[in-house]
């Protein structure tokens, strides 16, 4: 509440349509907010396109042919697994509830390590303590077992198992304090609209939920007109829209937002080498913002898309825990 109040008082962020009671998870950037946002965008754009001869920019349209979203799997599978608490009537992402439970286990380990370090002082061997302390080993074993079960449920798209994990871990609703959960259901996140002059002849189109597809469909256009040779990248900054059912945490999770995205195209067999290099490059960029190196960490995905060999998020420690800022 302090951050939200400060952001409004000093002209950074306003609730959109505030004079008409606002619109959930939709915000306007004020006179200072827009300057700050533009500075970050400019810094990112220059780091991507001006410092790399083999990365160029585009600005693709928000509307795209609906077949693109069908082919990419978004129409059928761009979903969040949601669960309701019957007592509080609040809705949550089932996967996030479990991820938060895993994070609590990690925190328990770190607290045990911190206590031991304080007790033993300079003679403390952290690596040995983590490997031999019975309490730490017990927590790690439980965490690893839960992580394995959770990852399998995600990969199998097993909604019943996600709910069972929540029940077995005795996860409670933070509002009501109860464990009275509904079944887990999938909700598609894409906004639909109609394009055409008449209702009968209109085509169903979507507000893009991400900027990547605009890059992919323009790959050949950019490659041919720019005479680009692999490896090369295409970057863009643009609006994206997601019908977030669970929209909380201020501007961290909004229904209309901007993405800064770069897709880097490499030769088959070289993807993991480039993946490792870009991980470190992007982490250095974030740390250069001066917000504190200890505030960042990598988080490997538990569930990979069918086309991916690896996926990692860069997370930042928000007031409400570590959350993804880049992936």
Where are the language model's segments positioned?
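TRNA-recognition modules of translation machinery and tRNA-sensing kinases, especially anticodon-binding
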Residues: 1-327
